[in-house]
C-alpha cells in the first residue's frame, strides 16, 4: 500500500487505488496512415513459432501435422471398431485376485 499525506492525519484512513497507464488510441486517421508501412514491415520480420534461442531439427520419428488430418482407410477402421474390441488390452476381462496388504508394524515400533 502507498502512503499518502492523509495517512499522517490521525483518525482518517484513505486507500490509494492504482490505475492503468493510458493506452495509445488506435483508429485516428493520421496514425493509421503512418502505421501501415510499419505494420507490414513488422509482419515480415515477426517471429512465427519454434524456439528462437536454440533452433533444433525435427526428429525423424515425429509425425507431420498433416498426418493427423488425413487418415488412411486402414486407420479409420481402427477408429470405428466395435466397443467390445476397444479398451484396455484385455486387462478388464481377466479376474484379478485381491491381494491384502501386509500388516503395518510401524505403529508397534513407535510405542
From Swiss-Prot:
Biological process, per Gene Ontology: centrosome cycle; DNA damage response; DNA replication; regulation of cell cycle; response to UV; translesion synthesis
Coarse class of the protein's main subcellular location: nucleus
Start-end of Basic and acidic residues biased regions: 74-84
Motif (KEN box): 78-80
Cellular component GO terms held in the UniProt record: nucleus; perinuclear region of cytoplasm
Motif (PIP-box): 62-72
Phosphoserine modified-residue sites: 8, 28, 31, 72
Residue positions of motif Initiation motif: 85-97
Disulfide pairings: none
Residues modified to N6-acetyllysine: 24
Subcellular localization, as worded in the UniProt entry: Nucleus; Cytoplasm, Perinuclear region
Ranges for region Disordered: 1-111
Entry comment on modification after translation: Monoubiquitinated at Lys-15 and Lys-24 during normal S phase, promoting its association with PCNA. Also diubiquitinated at these 2 sites. Following DNA damage, monoubiquitin chains at Lys-15 and Lys-24 are probably extended, leading to disrupt the interaction with PCNA. Polyubiquitinated by the APC/C complex at the mitotic exit, leading to its degradation by the proteasome.
Polar residues biased stretches: 1-10, 27-39
InterPro entries named among the record's database cross-references: PCNA-AF, PCNA-AF_dom
A Pfam family this chain is assigned to: PAF
Crosslink feature (Glycyl lysine isopeptide (Lys-Gly) (interchain with G-Cter in ubiquitin)) location: 15, 24
Alphabetical keyword list: Acetylation, Cytoplasm, DNA damage, DNA repair, Isopeptide bond, Nucleus, Phosphoprotein, Ubl conjugation
Keyword Oxidoreductase: no
GO molecular function: chromatin binding
Extent of motif D-box: 23-34
Record's comment describing the protein's domains: The PIP-box mediates the interaction with PCNA.
Subunit-structure text: Interacts (when monoubiquitinated at Lys-15 and Lys-24) with PCNA. Interacts with isoform 2/p33ING1b of ING1. Interacts with BRCA1.
PANTHER family documented for this protein: PCNA-ASSOCIATED FACTOR (PTHR15679:SF8)
Purpose of the protein: PCNA-binding protein that acts as a regulator of DNA repair during DNA replication. Following DNA damage, the interaction with PCNA is disrupted, facilitating the interaction between monoubiquitinated PCNA and the translesion DNA synthesis DNA polymerase eta (POLH) at stalled replisomes, facilitating the bypass of replication-fork-blocking lesions. Also acts as a regulator of centrosome number.
Protein name per Swiss-Prot or TrEMBL: PCNA-associated factor
Amino acid at each position: 500500500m502507498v502512503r499518502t499525506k492523509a495517512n499522517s492525519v490521525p483518525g482518517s484512513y484513505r486507500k490509494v487505488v492504482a490505475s492503468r497507464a493510458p493506452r495509445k488510441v488506435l483508429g485516428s486517421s493520421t496514425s493509421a496512415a503512418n502505421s501501415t508501412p510499419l505494420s507490414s514491415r513488422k509482419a515480415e520480420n515477426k517471429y512465427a513459432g519454434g524456439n528462437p534461442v536454440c533452433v533444433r531439427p525435427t526428429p525423424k520419428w515425429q509425425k507431420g501435422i498433416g498426418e493427423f488430418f488425413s487418415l488412411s482407410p486402414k486407420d479409420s477402421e481402427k477408429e470405428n471398431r466395435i466397443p467390445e474390441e476397444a479398451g484396455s488390452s484385455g486387462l478388464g476381462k481377466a479376474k484379478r485376485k485381491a491381494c491384502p496388504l501386509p500388516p503395518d508394524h510401524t505403529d508397534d515400533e513407535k510405542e
